[in-house]
Amino acid sequence: MPIPFKPVLAVAAIAQAFPAFAADPAPQSAQTLNEITVTGTHKTQKLGEEKIRRKTLDKLLVNDEHDLVRYDPGISVVEGGRAGSNGFTIRGVDKDRVAINVDGLAQAESRSSEAFQELFGAYGNFNANRNTSEPENFSEVTITKGADSLKSGSGALGGAVNYQTKSASDYVSEDKPYHLGIKGGSVGKNSQKFSSITAAGRLFGLDALLVYTRRFGKETKNRSTEGNVEIKNDGYVYNPTDTGGPSKYLTYVATGVARSQPDPQEWVNKSTLFKLGYNFNDQNRIGWIFEDSRTDRFTNELSNLWTGTTTSAATGDYRHRQDVSYRRRSGVEYKNELEHGPWDSLKLRYDKQRIDMNTWTWDIPKNYDLRGINSEVYHSFRHIRQNTAQWTADFEKQLDFSKAVWAAQYGLGGGRGDNANSDYSYFVKLYDPKILTSNQAKITMLIENRSKYKFAYWNNVFHLGGNDRFRLNAGIRYDKNSSSAKDDPKYTTAIRGQIPHLGSERAHAGFSYGTGFDWRFTKHLHLLAKYSTGFRAPTSDETWLLFPHPDFYLKANPNLKAEKAKNWELGLAGSGKAGNFKLSGFKTKYRDFIELTYMGVSSDNPNKPTYAPLSDGTALVSSPVWQNQNRSSAWVKGLEFNGTWNLDSIGLPQGTHAGVNVSYIKGKAKQTNGQETPINALSPWSAVYNLGYDAPSKRWGINAYATRTAAKKPSDTVHSNDDLNNPWPYAKHSKAYTLFDLSAYLNIGKQVTLRAAAYNITNKQYYTWESLRSIREFGTVNRVDNKTHAGIQRFTSPGRSYNFTIEAKF
C-alpha cells in the first residue's frame, strides 16, 4: 500500500478509539435552505458535504476564500495571478468545473479554457478570473465534494460551493427587535484593514438587514530568502523583439521575470448587502434583496517580461494595471406556508445579476528623456460583462406515516444570460493625455453571446423504521442549456463565414441523478452510501472563441458536448457524547473533457474541417488550425477522514477537544489514444490536526493547528497536452511541509469579542502546489526564467503573519 495511506489508516484506527457511544445526541433541528425539512432523531452526517455556519466563519477569522478552506485538505483555491483567485479545486477538477452559487444564483464563469489561455491569458490583459464574494455577507457556506448537479446545476462536476446570505431573522425576533454589530480588524499577510457593520431591525411585520463592509490592503507577502537576483541574458530570453544583440541587454535585476518579491499592489473592496421584508401574516411573506460589491486592484507589474532593466540606460516600459471585479444583484421573493395543500412551503424568487471583470493597462516609458514631450503612453481596456436574470419556484412537502416519513422537495426554474465584451486600445501623449496619437482600435476577440436555461427537479428523502433507522434519498433533475452567438450587423460576409451557426441556438440537455442510503445499524454507527452525477455545459469562450490568424488559427466549435461526471461514495460515521467521526472512500469518473485540439494544416476547401477563412475572405493554406473539442476522460479515487474527540470523556478538563481532517486522492486522465496520464489539478496528500480548549464559561478559548502536506511528485504531473510524457518543470520545487497555527478568542461581557491568530508560526518557507502550477512558460506575466528558474521565490507563500478582529454586538 502506498505510503500516503499510512496516515489515513492511522486516523482510521484512532476512530476505533473514539468513544462515540456514550449517550444519545440531542434531536436535530429542522434543516434550512436547499435542504428537505425533516426532523431526525440522530445526528445526520452526509457524505461529501460540509456546512460552515456563521459562528465557525467568525471563529476561523475568515476574510477570503483561502481562509474558508484553510483547514479542509480536500479543497483548495485556484491561484489567478495579480487579480486574485479563480475558483476552487475539488477532486481533480477546478475553475468552471466546480460550481459557485450565491443564494442559488450561479456566479461568473471564468475565461480559463485552454484556447483562451494560450492566446490571451499569458499576457495579463484580461481579468479572466471568477468573481469572489464578501464573506461578511454570509450566514452559511455549504461545500459539496463530488458531482452534484442535482442541487447545484451546471458546473458541479467535482463539487460545489454554495453561499447563503444573511437574513434579518438571523439576528432579530419578537423578543429582540433590533441588532447592531460592529466588526473591524487586520490581516497580516496582505497588510489588510477592514471594517464591517451589520444592522437589523423588526417593527410590526416589517424587517430589514444591512451589511456594509470595506477592506483595503496591499500585495500578498511571500517568504523569499533571496534578493532580486541578477541573471545574464543567454540569447534572446527576455525581449523577443530585440534587434540590438545580447550585448544590449546584459543583466536583469529587480524587475522582470527574475524578480523574487511580489509586485507592488494596492487594493480596495466595498460591499453592501441590503434586505427588506414584510410578513403579511404567519403564512405569507415578501422580500427584496440588493447586493453591490466592487474590488479595485492597482498593480505596478514589475515582474512583467517587458519591464526587465539593464546595466545601461533604462529601456522598456513601466506596466501598470487596474483590475476591477464588480457585482450587482437585485431580487424579490415570495414565501408561503400551508398546513394542508400541495406544499408545506413555497418560495418564488426572481433575481437579476450583473458581473463585470475589467482590466485597464498602461505602458509608461521609463525614460521620458528619450522622446521628451513626444513621449507616448499605451492604454488598453478589456471588459467582460455577464448579465443574468433567473426565476425559481421551490416547493417542500412532508407526509408522515405510522412508521415512515416522506419528505419531498420539487421545483422548477429558468433564466437567461447575456455576455458583452469590450476590447480597445490607443496611444496618447504622456504630457497631454487628451491628444491621441493613434486610432482607437476595437477588435472582436470574444464573440458576444446569449444563453437560456431551464430546469426542473424532484428530490425525496424517506425515513424508515423505528428511531429513524433507515434513510433513503433519491432525486432527479432535468436541465436544458442553450446559447447563441450574437449577430452583429457590422460583421462582413467573411466574418459570418467564420462563425458557424451564427444567431442559431446550440442546446445541451440531460438528466442528473442523486441517491443515497443511511443505515443506522447500531445506536451510534451509520453506514452511508451515495451515488450522484454532474454535468457542465460549455462556456461561452469554449464554444464561440474565434482567432483567425495565420500563425494560430482557432475555429469556434458550437457542436461541443457537455462534460459529464459520475460519483460513487461509501462511508462509515459515528457520533455520540464523546465526539464524532466520518471515514469515506470515493471514486469519480469524468468524460468528454473539453480540450484545445490540433486539427492539422488549413485548407482552402470550404467542405473540409480545416477550412480557415480570414476576415477579408482569404482562405489560409498550410496554417496550423486548432479547435476546442471533447476528448479525454479521467478517473479519481481517494479516502477522507475527519473526526472530533471531546477529551473530557477521558478525564481531561471539560472543553478540551482534538480533531483530525485527512484527504488522500489519486487519479489519471485517459487520452484519446488510450494513454493514461497524471492530472495536475490533483492536490497532494494533506492532513490537519487540531487541539483546542473552550472554557465551560464560554468566555475564552484557544486552538492549535498542525497542517502536514506532502510534496507533489514530478511523476504525478504532466507538462502539457502537447507533451504528455514529461513532468511539469516547476514540480521539482514542491516539497513536503508542516505548518503550525494558533488562534484564540476572548469574550468581554456579552457584547465584545476579541479574536487573534498567528499563522505559519515557525516562518516556514514553502510553495503550495496551486501556486507552482500557476506559473507560465510563455507570455509576459506569472513567469520565471524558464532555464534557471530564477524568480521562483516570488511564488512562495506568506511567512509568519497575524490576524486580529474585534467585534461588538448590541
Swiss-Prot record:
Pfam families registered for this protein in UniProt = Plug, TonB_dep_Rec_b-barrel
What NCBIfam families has UniProt attached to this entry? Answer: TonB-hemlactrns
Q: How does it sit in the membrane?
A: Multi-pass membrane protein
Q: What is this protein called?
A: Hemoglobin-haptoglobin utilization protein B
* TBDR beta-barrel domain mapped to chain residues: 175-810
Q: Which organism is it from?
A: Neisseria meningitidis serogroup C
Q: Does the keyword Transport apply?
A: yes
- Location in the cell: Cell outer membrane
Cellular component GO terms, alphabetically? cell outer membrane
